[in-house]
Amino acid sequence: ELAKESGAKYLVDSHVDRVEGNEVILRNGSKHTAKIIVGAGGHNDPLRRDHWDESSLKIPVKFVLMEGDFGDAVELHFGSMAPGGYAWMFPKSSGANIGLGIQRSFSKGCSLNQYAEEFISKYDGEISFRGAGSLPMSGSIHTFVKGNYLLVGDAAGMVLPSNGAGITIAMVGGRIAGQVIAEHLSDGTPLAEYQHRWNKQMGKVMRNSKRAFRFGSLMFRLPNWMLNLTFNRLTKGIIWRAVTCRRMFWIL
């Protein structure tokens, strides 16, 4: 509502076909012109697809929303239950978000559907929603700005690889992008300032998260018993620091 009061116009059920110059062209043929164009359409954002050539690792995920009482504890499961990724159960007020993501290179011939159905079947409750997608897990891309184009959120890889968190990170990126765009239009602040401010505020967290993900990818190759031993007894402090995007070792 605040955006509408400031002059924003929402086009629901509209799909972007491509972006050319200062024009956004929709699938229905209509065109919209803008001084600055922001891509916030997720990892398959059309602006990134057409104007960025940087690739990123994407982990396929499946999840359900299940009704019931699941307590207050968050569950995270690693190892053969979700090869190269993790399975989760996030309690909500009247149910839970239950699902998993995997790296196909670790899956040993089994499909995402097989892993997801096996894990979800461990919980009792009525499923009210089923969803699927993928998470960009390479961390933020190197360049958020090209000319008058900007990327934010998943389109810019603003997901922490070590834990899959992206909502808060995207909100930070969106706030910085909005501030810089406003300053650019009012006093000519370079749009590249968006990247500079992001790196200053979130760069260290993202670098630590990328390191933790690489460390985790090595650990996931271990047998389950060794992985459990590592998580539960030997390096709890290190694992927690990895998940929370802090430096695990002084040498990393």
Model feature map: region roles:
Residues 73-81, 161, 166, 194-198, ...:
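Short flexible/disordered coil segments
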Residues 179-252:
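C-terminal helical "tail/cap" subdomain of flavin- and related membrane-associated enzymes
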